[in-house]
């Protein structure tokens, strides 16, 4: 059984901040799903909404990678199935993090997704804002921190989730 958050991070204020950080990153994923699905006028307008025939992953893979070293690889991934995989990933990661459940699985999925996004935009190419660190890398590091500190236990349902029979038998679901 994993250790409770109170034994991993003993400072209650620090646990609250970790819980808030988990909620914030979870909302980044969840909001991205909602905006791309319904075209809420933030990063996605209604005409490009997924429900209106928009292709969120395909658009990213063919647009953000233009002129980048790995463009041909990422453009080859721009298929309709990738839209479903991307959107379900955003939804699943977002819901898991907001609720504080399945944080291990959400962290692994999120780090993989963000790793692909990091490589797609190739920040090391001349002209980017920072050749090493961008938001994808920062979010990935936060995702790694969340299950390591049992951040789902504070301001979330992590403690309850870890006690479920199926989760105790399949610890990757923690």
Predicted regions and their residues:
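Extended, low-polarity transmembrane helix blocks
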Residues: 1-92, 99-174
């Amino acid at each position: 059984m994993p250790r409770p958050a109170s034994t991993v991070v003993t400072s209650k204020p620090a646990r609250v901040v970790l819980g808030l950080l988990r909620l914030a990153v979870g909302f980044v994923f969840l909001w991205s799903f909602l905006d791309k699905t319904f075209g809420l006028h933030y990063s996605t307008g209604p005409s490009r909404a997924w429900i209106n025939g928009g292709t969120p992953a395909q658009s990213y893979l063919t647009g953000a990678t233009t002129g980048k070293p790995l463009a041909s690889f990422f453009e080859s991934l721009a298929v309709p199935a990738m839209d479903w995989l991307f959107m379900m990933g955003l939804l699943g990661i977002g819901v898991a993090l907001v609720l504080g459940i399945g944080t291990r699985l959400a962290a692994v999925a999120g780090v993989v997704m963000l790793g692909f996004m990091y490589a797609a935009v190739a920040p090391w190419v001349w002209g980017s804002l920072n050749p090493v660190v961008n938001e994808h890398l920062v979010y990935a590091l936060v995702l790694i921190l969340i299950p390591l500190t049992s951040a789902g236990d504070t301001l979330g349902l992590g403690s309850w989730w870890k006690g479920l029979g199926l989760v105790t038998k399949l610890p990757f679901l923690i």
